[in-house]
């Protein structure tokens, strides 16, 4: 890894209100891919604007994927990152689905940890705050034509953040969405592609106008079974069971989802992955079993 470090002369002072994704650290990690050469030129360098060609393939054909994870400081001032290996593996899963090159997991983890260590002074210390890590990859070919790009760029971007929603860690209101479909099986639903989020914007905007924070998506065929919320998976606690929709090819396999299932099982709780109809949820609510 090549290092170009920006020497900071003043102390970092974070604002009292961080928001989400509005503030960025001093450095980024970049690495390029070209056909025939593979991944090369890994560099940690000062944050700067990306240069793009008007014909860059990602602008026209949407070949873009990303991840989102967090780094924290413990009470002993140690830096911990939440399951970064699983996130990089999921990035590779998304890459395969839309014909993008995979990255070496061990090397990507090394680069990620190095970047976080260099900008560790940006990690907030307050409860509920963290350093958000956004790995993303996109096609960079300066050419028109519907095909996989020959060239790509991988970037790691860091941002000190508070809670994602304005409500903080309080419960949020979600609107059951049956006018639009987020994804269908054998589509892109199980991948973290930019296209999935673009497709969700109109529904989220309409929900916001009605006073809701997010959308609860139903399956794309029958519009009957729970799938996920706009930015997260969902669990439903019934009287004697905690259930979450099973992964069917249209649901993002969340890292937090996977962790919650593992913890609940270790606690000896009855957790299941299965089809959950919205009618079942409403019925359980009416009977006082939700």
Give short role names for the model-derived ranges.
Residues 105-107, 115-128:
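Charged, gly/pro-rich active-site loop segments
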Residues 124-134, 138:
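Extended, Lys/Arg-enriched charged tracts that mediate electrostatic binding to polyanionic substrates
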Residues 1-115, 136, 143-290:
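Helix-start/capping segments and mature chain N-termini
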